[in-house]
Design a protein with these regions (language model features):
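Active-site-adjacent segment of FAD-dependent monooxygenases/related oxidoreductases
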Residues: 40-154
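Solvent-exposed strand-loop boundary residues in beta-sheet-rich modules
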Residues: 37, 101, 178-180
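Extreme N-terminal starter segment of soluble prokaryotic enzymes
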Residues: 3-8
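Glycine-rich FAD pyrophosphate-binding loop
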Residues: 9-13, 22-47, 60, 64
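Conserved FAD-binding catalytic core of PHBH/FMO-like flavoproteins
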Residues: 130-249
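N-terminal Rossmann-fold NAD(P) dinucleotide-binding loop
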Residues: 17-18
Length: 249
């Protein structure tokens, strides 16, 4: 078993990094997650997350690959030991296409979709954090004991990756800077890049790859219902997904 156990360094401690870290740890591997953002600055990342696939091609591909409409729900059922209610079912909602003036152009319900589940980044993050290292807890997510046989799990906040060096048969050397300015190193068998669109891993390993403009800008945020008009509340309440039609924004 000792020869089988590997040390993974996951760069990026948001949802993708935690999904990866939990799975590897439950397979008895040792995992260290490096998250460059300090813990206190992570709260409130993202207004909302739909936990089911809603785009027809993605639905078809997901069902064909894993037989599910929600890999997130499946993952939580398999790995969540906190038994926290992680999403709210919104029923069989559809997608609203709006014109620029706010009127509804069309409403569609993806074929095969039985329900939509809504969660928040904060909720999913806290549930995953509690499941990763067994010492994290919040007012609504309890700490859980580590499962027997699981690998070591370490989550380092404020740890900024600075370099990656292939040591060949000796592994991979990972250098990082802590929030207090000190420099440290880790030796890993594998390094996983899960550090988002501004990936330092990609910048270090594939410096020739540059981000390209997709042709649009997405903005999202939250607003209190009391601050919007009654007409807007009704429009947004009737369907969970509202998108502007092409050439309409």
């Amino acid at each position: 078993m000792a020869d089988f156990i590997k040390h993974f360094v996951v760069v990026g401690g948001s949802l993708a990094g935690l999904f990866t870290g939990i799975m590897l740890s439950r397979l008895s591997h040792d995992v260290t997650i490096l998250e460059r953002t300090p813990a206190e600055a992570l709260a409130g990342q993202g207004a909302g997350i739909i936990v089911h696939s809603i785009v027809p091609p993605i639905i078809e591909a997901t069902v064909k690959l894993i037989g599910s409409l929600s890999p997130i729900v499946d993952f939580l059922e398999e790995y969540d030991c906190t038994h926290t209610i992680s999403y709210v079912s919104l029923g069989k909602c559809g997608i609203q296409y709006l014109k620029r003036d706010g009127t509804i152009l069309n409403t569609a319900v993806p074929v095969g979709l039985k329900e939509l589940g809504s969660a928040s980044w904060d909720l999913l993050y806290n549930v995953l954090r509690a499941n990763f290292d067994g010492v994290y807890a919040t007012s609504y997510v309890e700490a859980v004991a580590r499962e027997e046989g699981g690998g070591k799990a370490v989550y380092l906040s404020g740890a900024r990756l600075t370099s990656i060096q292939d040591l060949r048969h000796e592994g991979v050397k990972v250098d990082y800077e802590s929030s207090n300015g000190s420099n440290s190193s880790l030796i890993a068998d594998f390094v996983v890049g899960a550090d988002g669109p501004r990936s330092t891993v990609r910048k270090l390993l594939l410096p020739q790859v540059e981000r390209t403009y997709a042709g649009y800008v997405a903005w999202r945020g939250t607003v209190k219902e009391s601050l919007v008009s009654e007409e807007t509340r009704i429009l947004l309440k009737s369907k969970i997904w509202t998108v502007f039609h092409r050439r309409g924004h």
